[in-house]
């Protein structure tokens, strides 16, 4: 018989901390029921109000959910540091790791020459009264966004795409509000939504992005914000097509109460045209990161949007982090202005496309339908994730289980192709075919 985790504490803070410890250590797993308020109060010799306050704080932080007569349970994706990592099985010794979702370091532009040039040119250290955004960076960013059809009168910078999205959600929403997110979608975003105490509503995805019907359903369920990946959607590789963009803009036009967030994290690597939704709603933001083209360690994203939204994000940053390092801003500006770097990024995008298409073709030759219009990943629907991931691990290949990315979507696995060598394509496809049975064509979601 399983031993029940013993919650302890004599105050609401201590009780909530004890529950969080149980979740973090795995003693309280996803879906585990917490004791009824009065039962736990009697057990701990505290008032029911003290336990109720502890549970309220856990709900606010996205660790637990309350479902009427079903009581209070641990959330399926509680936002604690070890939870998401626990969903990803460790690579077997000597296994080829295709689970991480990172660009190929061999294809990233060299930063050394740009850093050396900055060291020679940079002036005195910037003081606390400096502007948050370098004017020259804002000027180049506006031109680059305008070339893609994104209005960019207002510009600020954040510490990466997720930082920008977090600030946007905090500026417009309150705990308990609903956010429409792609399903399957970016694991970090799903965890962020939970950590903020927001309620995710999954929107089905097909190769052209979030479906119109799915967005309409999410709006009917009360979504206050919608997050859309413009291109290279993680994990499916979807990209918003022109017809889908038109249909979504028409749908969103009558929603003055909705915050629209677009994430164009792939930027120049995407190799398909951008069809933005920017401006479809009064409150909107478009976020473009530099991490995929230039390297994950460059934590900078450009954020544009309506005047009020950008002002909220910039104002909150001023009383928090202050600003994104101007050294980093100057480095990004130098990379943007360098034609040689642009050529390297363009060739990297072409190479990712070639590797992705090679794996998709090899899977198709074995009766398997994978997906990946853009980006560095291939999404493969499977009947059973655990069986597929385990079989591939035993065969020497590590892939990411779809549970990292799903709310209600059908099972699948994500295979990162960014570092996939030509000689590995056929052996990998053979291993995948042996691990899963063929699945028919269709979308990614239930």
Language-model-detected regions and their locations in the chain:
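N-terminal basic, amphipathic alpha-helical segments
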Residues: 1-119, 126, 139, 318-324, ...
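Conserved core of the PLP fold type I
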Residues: 125-256, 268-282, 444
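Residue-level detector of anion-binding/catalytic polar loops
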Residues: 178, 199, 259, 369, ...
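Hydrophobic residues in beta-strands of the RecA-like P-loop NTPase core, especially within AAA+ ATPase
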Residues: 181, 262-263
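Conserved core segment of the aminotransferase class I/II
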Residues: 286-349
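Short hydrophobic/aromatic beta-strand micro-patches
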Residues: 304, 379-381, 416-418
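Conserved glycine-rich beta-strand-loop-beta hairpin in the small C-terminal domain of fold type I
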Residues: 349-360, 368-381
């Amino acid at each position: 018989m399983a031993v029940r985790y013993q919650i302890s504490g004599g105050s609401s803070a201590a009780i909530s901390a004890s529950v969080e410890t149980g979740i973090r250590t795995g003693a309280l797993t996803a879906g585990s029921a917490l004791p009824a308020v009065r039962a736990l109060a009697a057990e701990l010799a505290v008032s029911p109000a003290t336990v109720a306050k502890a549970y309220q704080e856990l709900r606010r932080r996205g660790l637990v959910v309350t479902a009427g007569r079903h009581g209070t349970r641990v959330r399926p994706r509680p936002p604690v540091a070890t939870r998401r990592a626990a969903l990803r099985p460790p690579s077997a010794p000597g296994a080829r790791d295709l689970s991480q979702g990172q660009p190929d370091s061999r294809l990233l532009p060299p930063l050394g020459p740009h850093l050396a040039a900055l060291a020679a040119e940079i002036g005195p250290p910037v003081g606390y009264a400096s502007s948050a955004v370098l004017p020259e960076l804002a000027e180049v960013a506006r031109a680059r966004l305008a070339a893609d059809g994104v209005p960019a009168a207002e510009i600020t910078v954040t510490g990466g795409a997720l930082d920008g999205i977090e600030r946007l959600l905090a500026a417009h929403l309150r705990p308990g509000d609903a956010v429409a997110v792609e399903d399957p979608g970016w694991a970090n975003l799903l965890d962020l939504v939970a950590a903020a105490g927001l309620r995710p509503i999954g929107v089905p995805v097909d190769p052209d992005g979030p479906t119109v019907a799915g967005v309409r359903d999410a709006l009917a369920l009360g979504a206050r914000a919608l997050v859309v990946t413009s291109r290279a959607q993680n994990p499916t590789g979807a990209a918003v097509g022109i017809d889908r963009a038109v249909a979504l803009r028409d749908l969103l036009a009558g929603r003055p109460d909705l915050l629209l967030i677009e994430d164009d994290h792939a930027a120049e690597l995407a190799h398909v045209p951008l069809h933005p939704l920017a401006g479809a709603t009064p409150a909107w933001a478009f976020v473009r990161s530099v991490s995929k083209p230039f390297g994950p360690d460059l934590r900078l994203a450009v954020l544009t949007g309506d005047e009020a939204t950008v002002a909220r994000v910039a104002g909150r940053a001023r009383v928090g982090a202050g600003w994104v390092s101007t050294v980093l801003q100057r480095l990004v500006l130098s990379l943007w202005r360098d034609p040689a770097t642009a050529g390297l990024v363009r060739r990297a995008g072409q190479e990712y496309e070639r590797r992705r298409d090679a794996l998709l073709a090899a899977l198709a030759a074995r009766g398997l339908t994978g997906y990946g219009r853009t980006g560095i990943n291939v999404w493969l629907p499977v009947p059973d994730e655990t069986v597929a991931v385990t079989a591939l691990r035993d065969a020497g290949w590590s892939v990411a289980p779809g549970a990292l990315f799903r709310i209600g979507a059908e099972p699948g696995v994500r295979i990162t192709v960014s570092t996939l060598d030509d000689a590995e394509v056929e052996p990998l496809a053979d291993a995948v075919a042996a691990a899963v049975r063929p699945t028919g064509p269709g979308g990614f979601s239930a």
